[in-house]
Amino acid sequence: MGKKRVYEFAKEMHVDNKDVIDIAKNLGIEVKNHMSSIDQDQEAKIKGMLSKQSAGKAPSSQAAKTPAKAAKTSSAAHKEAAKKPVAASAKSNDHADVAEHSQKNAKPAAKQENKPARSNKTSDGKIILSKSTILRPRSTQTAHTNTNHNRGGNTASANNTANGRNSNRSNNNNNNRSANNANRSGNNNRSNERNRNDRNRRFDNQRVTGPMPRAGRPTAANGNPRPVAGNGGKFVKPASERQQPKRQEAVKPANAASKRSEQPRTERPRTEQPAATTNQRFTKPAPVPAAAAPKPASAGSQDNRNSRRGGGNSNFGRSNSYGNRNGFNRNNRRNKKNKRRQQSAPKKEMPQRKERPLPETLIYEVGMNAQDLGKILHREPAELIKKLFMLGVMVNQNQSLDKDTIELLATDYGIDAQEKVHEDISDLDKVFEEENKNQDNLQPRPPVVTIMGHVDHGKTTLLDKLRHTHVTEGEAGGITQHIGAYQVKLRDRLITFLDTPGHAAFTNMRARGADITDIVVLVVAADDGVMPQTIEAIHHAQAAKAPIIVAVNKIDKPGANPDHVMEQLTEYGLIPEDWGGDTIFVKISAKFGKNIDELLEMILLEADVLELKANPDQKAVGTVIEARLDKGKGPVATVLVQQGTLHTGDPIVVGNTFGRVRAMTNDHGRRVKDALPSMPVEITGINDVPQSADKFVVFADERTARAAGEERAKRAQEEERKNTNHVTLDNLFETMKEGQLKEVDVIIKADVQGSVEALAGSLEKIEVKGVRVNIIHQAVGAINESDVTLAAASNAIIIGFNVRPTALAKAQAEQDDVDIRLHSVIYKAIEEVEAAMKGMLEPTYEEKVIGTVTVRETIPVSKVGTVVGGYVDSGYITRDAGVRLVRDGIVKYEGKLGSLRRFKDDVKEVRQGFELGLTIENYNDIKVDDQIEAFTMEQVPVK
């Protein structure tokens, strides 16, 4: 067999679960509760312990046999008494009623319910049993409740003869009196019939054999008794009716009460209650004899006092068996008690709002309202408005307050007031300087080297050799057009190189390169010597106070003279170390890679002397090397990190724009997440294309970055408006003189911002008498429809540098006759614009007839004019073409088409052989057989 649950074992052994659990724990068996399982061995152990305990209790059970025998004797006495005549029983009952009244009126007797039973004798020698004699000892377990008690049920009846049913009922009611009183409130609302059924079901050993007839209302017809005035409101029936039992019941032994009285009784604390009464339905009161009818004067008051106290009558407030109500509803009393208890209970205090202390100093801003001040002062806005009202200031909670009002309010509260000082977060130069001055946690960083020199002296070839790539082949004409930033690794050390253009147009870009560099490598061709851009590069490097390393290139060419180059450079303060100076000269050949490693070693040596360091743990700051507008990525900027570390997702302000770093790409085209100091990266995620040499600063959050970027953009726009020249009396003559000049309107679009600036500066420097260049728009990116629309509206020329027009822009330019010039070398762009300014300024146009129409029919239409119907004889007719009306070889009118239709549809063009309908704008004198010529004006190319 398997294991068995504790509760199953306890059920088999007829013991309590708790006893089994206690025995199991004493035996060391692991049992938690009645649902725990025990095996056969454990079951045997527990059985043995239970048998030992039962053996120990055997003597006590034998000692209890003597009271049992006495109980049997008393039971026999009851049976004999039941066989006596009915008259004796009636007489006994009458005396019992008298005893009951005397027992009730005695206060001490009512309070001694749990005392041992004692017998009393009347004057005639008859024995009267007290109520406590028939009480059972209180059960330790909870009994089924039955609250149907009546006053007459508590009468200690000695009548054990004819009316055995009443005796048993009274005994039963007394046995369950404690349980009934405890649960009286739960069954008050039950009907009488339901209570009777409950009682019969719960006490099977006392189940009656027949139904109990219900007494009706007392009338003359049925002869039911009425209450007797001197009997405390009881109904008294004739003794003859009470002598006949109406149903047979199981009669208990008469000595049951004595048996219970002999057993030891334990009292438990209980609330003192008045004596409960038995149910009137089961025990009908006996008529009071004439001798017992007179009562003391205090009996009525005593009964009233008992009834006022409740009297323990569970039928109080409901209809009795005779149809009368027995008082008011007990629930009302219970509700009143609960209400009094709630009123007497201590009430919970409402939570009070904690008053927060005032700040020592009120830091305010001009324009704050009462609501804003309330948050700072930890006060309600209504309180502040009330205080201001008392001070003579009428405001509402949303009205802005001036400085004096806020200080007056602070004085009333007894605190100081201080106006908040706003820090200009849009001043990037100040932030940039503060971050650069930060000397905490400095670590060595790679040097930033800028390669400078004249055009075609081999700068890009040298850098190409260093990176082992072929950058020069991708440049148009072999000339570097914009800055490139690269990193080279030598002996586990990095060097950052910047390649600057050598053309004169890129002066600003060279100056920017010198500003952000640590070391300048000046490349000079051994065969050409010092050239104008070489001298300019020297000046930029000296202005930036950057050390210069001279790389004499092309020493492999025939006719190369490095010593002559060294002599020329001494005139500009660059004296070789061999000649007693401090400038490092390295003779190299970039094409063949000669002495390249020596040049790199000299760069690292110079970097060690400079002790270059940066703090990688702070917020990143740096400089924009180049910027452009990518078709797929949007604005793209090449930046050089100078301090801190730039991370993907950092809020950033670049020049006059802002954004969040979406992605970073290094010089090899690979995505990176972090950019350390001296590392060039290409970033995306900014809102607009910044200018070259703009500073960038990383902010703590995007909100601050947005505010700083918008403020800088606003200031830049205001500065641009200030630069507009307005006409005044002082410059009126100059303005009129300039009005006589012819202007060449130009729109410049380039791939990067540096190229845009260089091309614009070069075009503005062109000097032609009577003509000047007016750059109406310059931007980075491809030529789009907006540029073409602007050019068409202002009659301007579009110059594209390393960019191409979009398909839609190209089609629109052809339609609007906008001239687009595309270049990849800056020389040709400058020369072409200069040639146009010197004599071929005004374009030449010639007329070209594109088609003719013969008028077949004319239809006058109101509010439209004359509609012409005809066929296209030759060529084609377009909607935007000019028309000329010819009649008999004479031109009658020249103008534009008003509309062009084919059937009911508006069309842009009708070809030869198709019929059409048209109108001529502002002309209606059209006749049949007139000829209409369509023509366009085409520009003659400049030769």
Swiss-Prot record:
UniProt-annotated stretches for the region G3? 499-502
**Which residues are recorded as binding GTP?**
453-460, 499-503, 553-556
Q: Where is this region: G2?
A: 478-482
State one Pfam family annotation. GTP_EFTU
Q: Which CDD domains match?
A: IF2_eIF5B (cd01887), IF2_mtIF2_II (cd03702), mtIF2_IVc (cd03692)
Q: Which GO terms describe its cellular component?
A: cytosol
Cite the GO molecular-function annotations of the record.
GTP binding; GTPase activity; translation initiation factor activity
Region annotated Disordered sits at 46-359
Point to the regions of Basic residues compositional bias: 331-342
Q: Where in the cell is it found?
A: Cytoplasm
Which residue range or ranges hold the tr-type G domain? 444-613
Give the signal peptide range.
none
Compositionally biased residues, Low complexity: 57-76, 142-190, 289-299, 315-330
User: Which InterPro entries is this protein grouped with?
Assistant: EF-G-like_DII, IF2_II, IF2_N, P-loop_NTPase, Small_GTP-bd, T_Tr_GTP-bd_dom, TF_IF2_bacterial-like, TIF_IF2
Q: Where is this region: G5?
A: 589-591
Residue stretches of biased makeup (Basic and acidic residues):
92-103, 110-124, 191-205, 239-250, 259-271, 346-358
Please list where the region (G4) is annotated.
553-556
What keywords would UniProt list here? Answer: Cytoplasm, GTP-binding, Initiation factor, Nucleotide-binding, Protein biosynthesis
Q: Where is the composition biased (Polar residues)?
A: 130-141
Region of interest (G1), ranges: 453-460
Origin: domain of life = Bacteria
What's the family?
Answer: Belongs to the TRAFAC class translation factor GTPase superfamily. Classic translation factor GTPase family. IF-2 subfamily.
| UniProt cross-references to HAMAP family, sorted A to Z | IF_2_B (MF_00100_B)
What is this protein's function per UniProt?
One of the essential components for the initiation of protein synthesis. Protects formylmethionyl-tRNA from spontaneous hydrolysis and promotes its binding to the 30S ribosomal subunits. Also involved in the hydrolysis of GTP during the formation of the 70S ribosomal complex.
Q: What is this protein called?
A: Translation initiation factor IF-2
Origin species: Lacticaseibacillus casei (strain BL23) (Lactobacillus casei)
